[in-house]
């Protein structure tokens, strides 16, 4: 009897030890996965670089490209990022990418530093802001696109030896674009905050551009695609009110100047309840920044400020499945917004949850949703669940970040990655030849696009790993930029 009881006790203790060990190993694996994903998410931006590559370039299968950008307008427009799987520089999504990279550095700076990625993250940000500075040569002039979308998309070529037109397009007082100017102002203002602790002079340059761009956007209202018509078929803007609020919120945070807060409180509306936060809809971003001010008690939390906060928290409640109009979830648990590149919306929503979790923690506050309360820890856990899904905890057992894990997309829709590196084979790739030899090639891409996030699975958790499946298989900078911050937050 005694022996049996002792044996049972030993068996129980052994079982507990095994469970604890397995759980510990699982946590270690997840933690390592987060570290790998964070590192590779920043490598992705190196693969998207346009222009003269620096000596410390780590993605060595890429080469210099588009070294004459801007020459048609007698201006240097080299640098910046290609937006997705093509060879285009679209200023509207590029500016949003920049703002989200900056926000990641601002809110998760200490985490990025702890994970030894702050330097890489700031370098990714500066590659974008250096270009945006070039693109804004005069207060009321902003270059918003390089390349022609239609001709670029008709060809499947490497950026290093592409022969498609590199036309420079701009907005100015006679050809306005409040949305483009407003988003670029937001990017410059946010980046100025990120760089201020390290390079005050550079931060001051950025804030000067941000102020000029915001003034330009207000003084000369208009949709940018009416001036840069070529952009309309690719990144058309649905309005510019959100960009102006977003820019004002960032300028207020960067300068603490009352005139920007006045703009926000005197605006005709706060954007109302939103269903997404993305490159064409920044209302949620502005609402969250204003809610932060209210939580910090830096402004009165009634009237217009209270409305911003209410709208921000309504979006969060819906993402947490505790709202009145909840975001759809796939059977596997992914927040599902829209079919085309759904992960761009998942990563921005996850960023909002991660950032707001920090705001609530600092304020010792919670959110009262229609279907229950949310604590700061709840928000971070939801964000972590989305990261885990994206990195492989899903019905497909697939990581949707290229190069992370063993089962990840092998054929993302991406010209540079799908064609042999110019460093290995300098034979020119022609417009149609690229389609014949590389686009239609059933083999995996010859270059691994480390850290890229594809568009992701459909509403039933199904993903098709084919280059032709661009709605699911094309990565974009707007998807990865917020994910940098989320990865740092959930680590």
Swiss-Prot record:
Reactions catalysed, as given in the entry: Endohydrolysis of (1->4)-beta-D-glucosidic linkages in cellulose, lichenin and cereal beta-D-glucans
Keyword Phosphoprotein set for record: no
Gene Ontology BP term (one): cell wall organization
The protein's Enzyme Commission number: 3.2.1.4
Species classification: Eukaryota, Viridiplantae, Streptophyta, Embryophyta, Tracheophyta
One Pfam assignment: Glyco_hydro_9
Organism: Arabidopsis thaliana (Mouse-ear cress)
Name of the protein in its database record: Endoglucanase 12
Glycosylation sites: 6
Domain of life: Eukaryota
């Amino acid at each position: 009897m005694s022996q049996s009881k002792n044996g049972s006790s030993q068996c129980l203790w052994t079982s507990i030890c095994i469970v604890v060990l397995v759980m510990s190993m699982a946590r270690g694996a997840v933690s390592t996965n987060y570290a790998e994903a964070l590192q590779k998410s920043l490598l992705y931006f190196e693969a998207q670089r346009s222009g003269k590559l620096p000596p410390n370039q780590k993605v060595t299968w890429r080469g210099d490209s588009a070294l004459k950008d801007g020459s048609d307008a007698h201006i240097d427009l080299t640098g910046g990022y290609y937006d997705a799987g093509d060879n285009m520089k679209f200023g509207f999504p590029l500016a949003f990418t920049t703002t989200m990279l900056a926000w990641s550095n601002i809110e998760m700076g200490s985490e990025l530093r702890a994970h030894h990625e702050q330097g890489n993250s700031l370098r990714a940000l500066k590659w974008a802001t250096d270009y945006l500075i070039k693109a804004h040569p005069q207060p009321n002039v902003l270059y918003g696109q390089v390349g022609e979308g239609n001709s670029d998309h008709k060809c499947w070529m490497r950026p290093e030896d592409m022969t498609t037109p590199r036309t420079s397009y701009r907005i100015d007082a006679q050809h306005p674009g409040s949305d483009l100017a407003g988003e670029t102002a937001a990017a410059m203002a946010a980046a100025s905050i990120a760089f201020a602790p390290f390079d005050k002079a550079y931060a001051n340059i950025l804030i000067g551009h941000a102020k000029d761009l915001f003034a330009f956007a207000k003084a000369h209202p208009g949709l940018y695609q009416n001036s840069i018509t070529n952009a309309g078929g690719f990144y058309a803007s649905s309005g510019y009110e959100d960009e102006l609020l977003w820019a004002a919120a960032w300028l207020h945070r960067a300068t603490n100047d009352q005139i920007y807060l006045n703009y926000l409180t005197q605006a005709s509306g706060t954007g109302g309840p939103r269903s997404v936060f993305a490159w064409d809809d920044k209302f949620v971003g502005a609402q969250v920044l204003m809610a932060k001010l209210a939580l910090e008690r830096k402004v009165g939390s009634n009237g217009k400020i209270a409305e911003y906060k209410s709208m921000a928290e309504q979006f969060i409640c819906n993402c947490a499945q505790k709202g009145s109009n909840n975001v759809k979830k796939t059977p596997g648990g992914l927040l599902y917004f829209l079919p085309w590149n759904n992960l761009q919306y998942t990563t921005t929503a996850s960023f909002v949850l991660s950032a707001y979790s920090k705001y609530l923690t600092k304020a010792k506050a919670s959110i009262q949703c229609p279907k229950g309360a949310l604590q700061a820890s709840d928000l971070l856990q939801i964000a972590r669940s989305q990261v885990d899904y994206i990195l492989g905890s899903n019905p497909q057992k697939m990581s949707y970040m290229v190069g992370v894990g063993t089962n990840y997309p092998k054929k993302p829709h991406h010209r540079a990655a799908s064609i042999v590196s110019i460093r290995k084979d300098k034979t020119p790739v022609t417009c149609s030849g690229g389609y014949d030899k590389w686009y239609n090639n059933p083999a995996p891409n010859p270059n691994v696009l480390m850290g890229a996030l594809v568009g992701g699975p459909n509403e039933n958790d199904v993903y098709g790993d084919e280059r032709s499946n661009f709605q699911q298989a094309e990565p974009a900078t707007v998807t990865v930029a917020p994910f940098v911050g989320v990865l740092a937050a959930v680590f």
